[in-house]
Amino acid sequence: GALLARTQRIHISTGIVSLYLRPPTLTAMQAATLDLIAPGRARLGLGVSTQNINAFHGVPWDHPVSRTREYVAILRRVLAGERVTYDGKFYRPRGFQLSMAPPKRIPIYLAAVNPKMLQLAGEIADGVLLAWLPARQVRQSIAEIAKGAARAGRSLADIDIGCYIH
């Protein structure tokens, strides 16, 4: 917080919020709060984690791609200031609306590893965070992102691609 208060250009991002561990409405509230702290500089990183990590929390790990698609759809509407009622397979918010929506769109980044999630990220995300892959797989991962982007009528240039380095 102190760093953000003293700067104007540094962005802040959630590393990766596990979408299995909190509903999209709560994540939207947290993202809106980040945007209040650093107006126009918040970014939201989301991911599905792994079966093993979800098991630690006692949370099932099912339908990661369709769950992510639904989550992001709800999140975008809530962050746009809409009153959201959604009848999804996984989430069903009823009349939820932020008391104060962010004035600018908060970019959503998806952590992705497997081809289907990489394609989904290319289709619906503002950015993609690659992790846990050897350098030789980066080119193929980017090709999968490009496939998803093309399906949505987007260009790879529309998507910010980052990579965790370990």
Positions of predicted regions on the chain:
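Active-site-adjacent structural elements that line small-molecule/cofactor binding pockets in enzymes
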Residues: 1-166
